């Protein structure tokens, strides 16, 4: 049978924590979420695990190295956009090596630490939901289906 199968996209997201604060990056010039804060993350490129993808994204975006054993999976959000669907996988890390540096200044205006319970008003709604879910122990959620 040659049925066309539905395909969805998968992204990884890193909630990087230090002293009850989360690292957020202000997006710019990406065409998606510009002017809003997001977390480290991106698409799984293929031929890599989700954990490998989040390690790669951390290196590419903020120049840090994560030990795979120190990355904890904390949740999934099934996200609906107008043109496609995503599975977003969320991980937490509280230890890393290397000095934080904005390695993608074209995509990220800057990065900043924020209290977990006091995120800026311009945090991307998906990220706001994901961080709230993490704090409240919610491991699965759906986003964008009511719009």
Question: What are these model-predicted stretches?
Answer:
Residues 21-60:
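Conserved Nudix-box catalytic region and its N-terminal flanking loop in Nudix hydrolases
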Residues 102-135:
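NUDIX/MutT-family hydrolases
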Residues 1-23, 92:
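Conserved N-terminal beta-strand and adjoining loop/helix that marks the start
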Residues 129-147:
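Charged phosphate-binding loop/patch that engages nucleotide di/tri-phosphates or the phosphate backbone
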Residues 65-75:
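A short coil-to-beta-strand element that immediately follows conserved catalytic motifs
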Residues 9, 17, 34, 39, ...:
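Short connector loops at helix/strand junctions that flank enzyme active sites
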Residues 31, 79-83, 105-106:
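A short beta-turn/loop motif at secondary-structure boundaries
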């Amino acid at each position: 049978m040659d049925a066309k199968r539905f395909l969805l996209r998968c992204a990884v997201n890193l909630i990087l924590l230090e002293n009850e604060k989360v690292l957020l990056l202000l997006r710019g010039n990406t065409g998606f979420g510009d002017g809003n804060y997001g977390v480290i993350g991106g698409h799984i490129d293929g031929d890599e695990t989700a954990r490998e993808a989040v390690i790669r994204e951390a290196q590419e975006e903020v120049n840090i190295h994560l030990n795979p054993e120190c990355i904890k999976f904390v949740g999934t959000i099934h996200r609906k956009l107008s043109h496609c669907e995503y599975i977003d996988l969320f991980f937490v890390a509280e230890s890393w090596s290397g000095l934080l540096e904005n390695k993608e200044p074209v995509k990220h205006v800057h990065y900043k630490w924020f209290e977990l319970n006091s995120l800026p008003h311009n945090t991307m709604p998906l990220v706001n939901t994901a961080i709230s879910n993490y704090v409240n122990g919610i491991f699965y959620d759906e986003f964008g289906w009511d719009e």
